[in-house]
Amino acid sequence: MRILKIIGMIAGGLVALFLIVAAVLPSSYRITRTVEIETPAEMIYPLVVNLPNWPKWDPFTEQEPTAKSTFVGEPGTIGSEWSWVGEVIGTGSMTVEEVVPNRYIRSRMEMIAPQPMVAQDLWDFTPTASGTKVTWTVQGDLDYPMGRIFGLFMESLMGSTFEKGLANLKRLSEQQTVAPLSSNDSR
């Protein structure tokens, strides 16, 4: 009986320690990556704001090209949405919430499975002497306690994926000779 009591006290102490550590960890995260692309923003922006273009460069889509994608609304406009269902990439959606043409995009990303999560997907396009500085940021809140523990690893798990996405976007943008269709094109 005494051994069970000791094991119970140790287990309770570990749970308490876990909860205390989680309580002092950050309640939000922010991952930001930047790349210089040697082309004007007018060539890059449509590849990001028009959600049907994401599968051409998105690193998450590369992980599961057979995932089912659905696009709703006029591409490149506020309210346009991309939803996906896959065994590897899970189930989620992205909705465009704010745009400043060739300068800024803010979207809401919602993961339903495997782990529910809501985040802001932010894009900045800044003109430079040789092209455009593109900054991709994802930020959101972390639930207590497990989300905060997971947040410790978010940068190391996701940072390289963002870098790959920006490298794909850079390659695709610099290979184009004509800007992709924008939401205002009727072609």
Region locations from a protein language model:
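Extracytoplasmic/periplasmic/luminal assembly and interaction segments
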Residues: 51-100, 147-149
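Beta-strand elements of well-folded, non-transmembrane domains
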Residues: 37, 88-90, 100, 111-115, ...
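A short, structured loop/turn motif at beta-sheet edges
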Residues: 38-42, 97-104, 124-133, 171-175
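Sec-exported extracytoplasmic/periplasmic mature domains
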Residues: 49-56, 98-104, 154, 167-175
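Short, highly charged C-terminal tails/helix-capping segments
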Residues: 68-69, 170-187
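Beta-strand/loop substructures that line and gate deep hydrophobic ligand-binding cavities in soluble
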Residues: 3, 108-163, 169-171, 181
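Short, surface-exposed coil-to-beta transition loops
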Residues: 31-32, 89-94, 117-122
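Hydrophobic ligand-binding cavity/cleft-lining segments
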Residues: 2, 6-74
